[in-house]
Amino acid sequence: MFARRALGACLLATPFLARGAAAQTRLRLAHTLQPSHSWNVAAEGFAREVNERSQGRLAVQVFPGGQLGAGRQVLEGLQTGTVEMTIVGSSDLNSFEAKFGIVEMPYAWLSREQAFSALEGPLGEALSTLIAARGMINLGLWENGLRHVTNRRQPINQPADLRGLKIRTPPDRVRVDTFRALGAEPAPLAFGELYSALQQGLFDAQENPLSIVYTSSFFEVQRYMSLTGHVWGGAHLLASKRVYDRIAAPDRALLGELGRKWGVEQRKMIQDSDDEFARQLREKGMLFNEVDKPAFQRAVQPVWQQYDGVFGPEIMGLYRRAVA
């Protein structure tokens, strides 16, 4: 009799236990960079604060180093809801929404601050609306930083020095076309495969911010650091719309609040660490040089003409007002 009553009590309790378990939403936050990079440091801070302030309703866990896949794989996972959150560079979004390419056009911004203002203003709102239609919710502007060219052959001073150089780019049409305009031989490759490709000599060169060059140990396979600053790289904390729409409104607001807060913190980390990364890269043996920036800016003007029609009058108008 006691056993039957106990079993009956367990069966009655089961729906309540199931509902209690379902009350916690697990959010895996994936990215491709190393644990020492500012993306990951800020992501861990974001996760801790979300978990604490949601009182256990949300459980964010960070997966660095491409553990859940490369950028495109993770973004496709966001669309289907099989991955809940990610941090990606702006260029990763171009293959899902071509107009997002405006963010990392060559020499698009006079300063980081100008880019922040534009992407936290009407231009950023328009781009966020476009990717929301692709199943991705933008929770905050983060940063990759200024990108520079490294290579194993020679210093790059003029665009002519890139002629014939095999350079890896992200899987991004804009970046490929930029380096074609500069005379290089670009080819896209997923970030997770880049170190071994450089090590094997499949590429002569690559381009990334100082923080990524250092934390990914590219100084082991590259000799020259030419400060081209050809692209300011944005980054974004994204959530799967399928998952986000199932979260209660107060917790959605919390994710947005903390996504923006930790984005600001991460951007400060990038700014504060650039000089230190440059010093450490020099200590590792990399040879730095400045470039003829006006010559590079002139050489990429055809890329702007090529993409004007891709971005369309609305996005180009918002961009021009942002930089006026």
Model-derived regions, located:
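N-terminal secretory/targeting leader peptides
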Residues: 2, 9-14, 24-114, 122-125, ...
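Short, intrinsically disordered low-complexity segments
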Residues: 3-4, 18
